[in-house]
Amino acid sequence: MVKAVAAIVLVAIGAPAWAQMTPEGLWRNVDDKTGEAKAEIRIRDTGAGGLLGVLEKRLSKDAKPDDVCKECTDDRKDKPVLGLEIIRGAKKADGKDVWEGGKILDPENGRNYTLRLTPIEGGKKLEVRGSIGPFGRTQTWQRVE
């Protein structure tokens, strides 16, 4: 009985740490060049094993509430940037705390990049890598909640 209670307590204590080693949640996007907070993106599981990230809040000084994705070339063309799906389809890699295989959209230029998401620092930060072939860049996002 004591062993069972101890096991339950250990699982309960460790569960919050496990839950945070996922890209799901609300993240603040920080520009890797300027250090400026640009937006808040909510990432959630679609239920089909893939992730979806929606731009919930714009933080840039020059952001306008009625901005649309003029440069997008897919179903997001001319859609409001606020509420735009910028992450689609990333799935957890087998045996790793990495989500890949999806795409991330840069609403400023309309380009889609191959995506890799890696929670770091116990899930407090998220490495977001967007690439085309061997070329890409990495941003570190901060967990908001």
Put a short name on every predicted segment.
Residues 1-4:
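Positively charged n-region of N-terminal signal peptides that target proteins for export
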Residues 6-7, 17:
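Cleavable N-terminal signal peptides
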Residues 13-19:
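Sec/Tat signal peptide C-region and signal peptidase I cleavage site
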Residues 24, 29-115:
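Central antiparallel beta-sheet cores of small beta-barrel/beta-sandwich binding domains
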Residues 34, 108, 121, 132-134:
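A generic beta-sheet turn/junction motif
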Residues 47, 120-122:
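Structural motif
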Residues 123, 132-145:
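Edge beta-strand at a domain terminus
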